[in-house]
Amino acid sequence: MDDRFAALRDATASALLRGPGATSVELRQLIARGEPPPDLSSLVEQIRSHAYTVTNEDVDALRARYTEEQLFEIIVAAAFGAAQERLSAARRVLEGA
């Protein structure tokens, strides 16, 4: 199946998961895989499964440990990882049809 957006996704993944940032590359990769450290597990799981339910209070609870830039990267890595997994699952179904 042709994937005309693969190069764009790869560039996004490279910048997000392997580029410089306020958080470590390792942390962003763990989060994208759905394997965050314990202090982030609740937020990351919520983003990956029910992002629409995340509230300011959920994020505020982490502000004592993480900067605004770090929280942004954490949230984006969680959303990107979930999106990648869903896209991969959908492509497998379509290719099997």
Give, region by region, the residue ranges found by the protein language model:
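Hydrophobic alpha-helical segments
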Residues: M1-A97
